A protein has these predicted regions:
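Extracytoplasmic metal-acquisition and chelation regions
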Residues: 23-168
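Positively charged n-region of N-terminal signal peptides that target proteins for export
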Residues: 1-5
Length: 168
């Protein structure tokens, strides 16, 4: 009985803390990678609570979705994607399962960070698997270029200002 009561109290406390932080203007941000999460934390400061789905040691092309990812996406106010189809193998089912209209592509809470930078290595002509590991939409590892970090940060700043206009 005591264990059940402890679990119930913990769940209620989590719900209250989550609701209070959101009511105080904290945005829940989910990102594809830790790199994007780091940028979001630096830009948003104490106004954001950031969760990265892919860990730094993981290949961001092949992330094994977890149930906790669906919950994070369901609660998110903003999702920041690498884009360029990097997440194609694992993100679409998460977005669908999240049932969160705010973070769907094209919605106010969806940011494709690749749209803020110049993309390199966009292949031309017919693309086949015989060419090896080719990214049809261009190199999605653009965030590794140090100068692009500033451009991504500016896009994140603009999106956060749109979502929290009183704090802009």
């Amino acid at each position: 009985m005591t264990k059940k009561l402890s679990v119930l109290v913990a769940v209620v406390a989590e719900l209250l803390v989550g609701t209070m932080s959101h009511a105080q203007g904290t945005l829940r941000v989910v990102t594809s990678t830790e790199d994007l999460a780091s940028i979001a934390r630096e830009v948003g400061g104490d106004r954001v609570d950031v969760t990265a789905l892919a860990r730094g040691y993981q290949d961001p092309h092949f992330v094994d979705p977890k149930p906790s990812f669906i919950l994070a996406m369901n609660r998110a106010d903003l999702y920041i994607a690498v884009g360029r189809d990097l997440e194609l193998g694992w993100l679409p089912p998460l977005l669908t399962s999240s049932r969160n209209a705010k973070v769907q592509p094209g919605a106010i809470g969806y940011l494709d960070a690749s749209r803020s930078v110049r993309i390199l290595e966009i292949p031309t002509g017919q693309i086949t698997r015989a060419m090896g590991d080719v990214h049809p939409l261009g190199n999605p590892h653009y965030w590794l270029e140090p100068g692009n970090g500033r451009l991504i940060a500016a896009a994140v700043r603009d999106k956060l200002s749109e979502l929290l206009p009183a704090d802009a």
